[in-house]
Amino acid sequence: MGSKTPHNHRRGPNESSSPPAIDAINPPKQAAASGLVHGSLEGESEGGEDEDDDKPGADLKAVGQIGNDGQKRNKRKKKKKKKNTKELEILQTTPPRVALANIFRSQRYPEAEIVKYSTDNDNLQRTTTEELRHLSVLNAMDDEFLNDYRKAAEVHRQVRQYVQTIIKPGIALSQLAPEIEDGVRALTNHQGLETGDALKAGMAFPTGLCLNNIAAHWTPNPGAKEVILQYDDVLKIDFGVHVNGRIVDSAFTMAFNPVYDNLLAAVKDATNAGLKEAGIDSRIAHISEAIQEVMESYEVELNRKVIPVKAVRNITGHNILHYKIHGDKQVPFVKTQTNQRMEEGDVFAIETFGSTGKAYLDDATGIYGYGYDENSSTTGLHHSSAKSLLKTIKENFGTLVFSRRYLERLGVQRYHLGMRSLVTNGIVQSYAPLVDVPGSYVAQFEHTVLLRPNCKEVISRGDDY
């Protein structure tokens, strides 16, 4: 999910993005099975009945006494049947609806792409002060942190690989969005219908389904005109998955007409260039320059006219915080002047947008979604409907971005007046669709990368992109 560059925004080198640490509960480990072997008492049969000492011909022997044949009395031992401990393998369904917890019984999820840091890093020796400043971030990047991220990434991979098989000309976008979101909720095993359940795991923000010159922040909403995918469309699919507030943000573009192949290749290569340059102490200005250089080395031919691919100037990649899709660091797609660097423990969404238009985005009409600002003041809030709605938002979404569809899914009704009051008072921020000029085409690719102490993990990397 792209972060739009605000007007008159200045990025300082000392901005902090340390997410608060959270307490996570480890699943209990299974105790090793143990048991006691019970033998029959001397003088009792294996069936538990006393032997009859008065039985004619019975030999009376003390415990351990040697019989006439010189052998100790041995009792027959029942052979124990070996239990088949092998568990049946559970496979994912099509569409994916089996919770990952049922497939990964150990609750350990696969690593993504691991990239070792270059040994020629020009600033590997960080000062003690900087290390102390990031100590809380590094402490939070423990096994639970990594496992939550890997689970969210695995959900994203399985869902997107399925939806790529059903995205074809003729599909309605109002049908596609629920396919993605229902898959995420099924695989995380959190439907989000009970109060607070969506904060445990599920959608990190509404599914973005943006056609052609619509670059970002469009999703089907109730009452909107139906949109059907066409052969000549360029469709960007951008959705996020979170587990315990650890957000994986990843996006890709699909087109059916091969005339757009170079546009998609330009953006995918530019994103990979940004991922290659990302790392501890990497200068954001250097990353931006590398992205632009790769992106703008491509051109496309549309209607017998050669058009250069341009890097979009006023939307950026961004760092990700706990339960917050947008942090305070931005990664532009064009050369910029900033002293800001990436830091150990950071989580970044490295994304790029390339356009055949003017490569500058404007707000369009309509609302994509909403996000609660936890630092806002509610002193000016007087409408009871607004207060009730705010309570619902806090309990079910917190600072995660949500849409009207998500509210109505919870059964919330007649919320428009209350929402208007929340937006007017700056308590909730609204997001509008972002568009380039009509007739242009925009593509997007995006991955989430974790800057771990000894390597970077492109957590959302898959076989598809």
UniProtKB/Swiss-Prot annotation:
Give the principal location in a single coarse category: cytoplasm
Q: What is the recorded name of this protein?
A: Methionine aminopeptidase 2-2
Give EC number(s), comma-separated.
Answer: 3.4.11.18
What is the role of the protein in this entry?
Answer: Cotranslationally removes the N-terminal methionine from nascent proteins. The N-terminal methionine is often cleaved when the second residue in the primary sequence is small and uncharged (Met-Ala-, Cys, Gly, Pro, Ser, Thr, or Val).
User: For a divalent metal cation 2, which residues are the binding ones?
Assistant: 249, 318, 351, 446
Question: Where is a divalent metal cation 1 annotated to bind?
Answer: 238, 249, 446
Catalysed reaction(s) here are:
Release of N-terminal amino acids, preferentially methionine, from peptides and arylamides
Lineage at the top is: Eukaryota, Fungi, Dikarya, Ascomycota, Pezizomycotina
Asked if Hydrolase is a keyword of the record, the answer is yes
The biased composition feature labelled Basic residues covers 1-11, 73-84
Q: Where is the protein situated, by its record's location annotation?
A: Cytoplasm
Q: Name one GO biological process term.
A: proteolysis
Could you list this entry's UniProt keywords, alphabetically sorted: Aminopeptidase, Cytoplasm, Hydrolase, Metal-binding, Protease
Q: Which residues bind substrate?
A: 217, 326
- Which co-factor is required? Co(2+); Zn(2+); Mn(2+); Fe(2+)
Q: Where is the composition biased (Acidic residues)?
A: 43-54
* Chain spans, region Disordered: 1-89
Q: Which family does it belong to?
A: Belongs to the peptidase M24A family. Methionine aminopeptidase eukaryotic type 2 subfamily.
Q: Name one GO cellular component term.
A: cytoplasm
Read off the Pfam families from this record.
Peptidase_M24
